[in-house]
C-alpha cells in the first residue's frame, strides 16, 4: 500500500487507533501516517510508542477503564468533530503463567475469564459506545475491531482456548448488533470485525512453532492487508467478520 492507496475515504480523514502501542496497532499507525488522505491520527493507548510518527496525537486510554475512555474521547473531540476510521487493535490471549489458553474445562478460572472478556469484548464495545457518534454521515466511515478466526463458532472443530474463543465470539456479536443500530442512524457507516491472520507479535509468539513461515505475517504486512480490506468495504458489508484476505468468515 502506497500513499495513494486509501481511496474510499474523504480527502481529510481523521483516524483513531485504539491499542496503538501493540504490534499491529503501531504498524497501522505508521502506515496510515503515509496516506495522503489522512489528516489526523489519534494514537490511543496506555503508553505512547509512536513518538515522531507524522500526523499523530497521543491520547492516553486504558480500554479496561470506562472513565479513561471518556477522557480520551473528550480529548479527541477538542481537536476534531469527526472520526472517519476507528480501529480497535487491542486484545489478549495470555499473560504470564497464570493466564494461558485453556486446553481443558478443568483449567477454567473465573478471574481469567473476566480478564479476557474485559479486554477482548467489553473494552471494544465501550469504545464503540463513545466513538460511533463521531462518525460522519455524509461519507464513508468504518469502525473495525480486531477479532480472530478462532472466535467463529462454525469454524471451531478442535475446542480449547475457551476464554479467548468465547470473548472473540462475543465481540463479533456485539459488533453485529452495533452495525444494525448504526446502519439505521448512519447508512454510510460500516462496523465490522477483522481477523488479521497469524501475526508475529507478542500475542502469537508462544504458538508460532506450528505456523508455516508463509502464513506468519509481520505487523507491517498485516497492516497492509487490513487497510486494503477496510478500504474495499462497501456499506452492505457491515456486521460481518472479515479475514485478512477479504473473505467473510461465518460466525
Per-segment meaning from a language model:
Residues 201, 205-251:
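C-terminal helical subdomain
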Residues 20-34:
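N-terminal Rossmann NAD(P)H-binding glycine-rich loop of SDR-like oxidoreductase domains
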Residues 33-52:
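Conserved glycine-rich Rossmann-like NAD(P)H-binding loop of the short-chain dehydrogenase/reductase
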Residues 30, 125, 169-180, 223-227:
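Conserved active-site helix of classical SDR/Rossmann-fold NAD(P)-dependent CH-OH oxidoreductases
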Residues 75-90, 94:
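A glycine-rich helix->loop->beta "capping" turn
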Residues 52-69:
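Rossmann-fold cofactor-recognition segment
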Residues 92-119, 137-185:
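Catalytic loop of short-chain dehydrogenase/reductase
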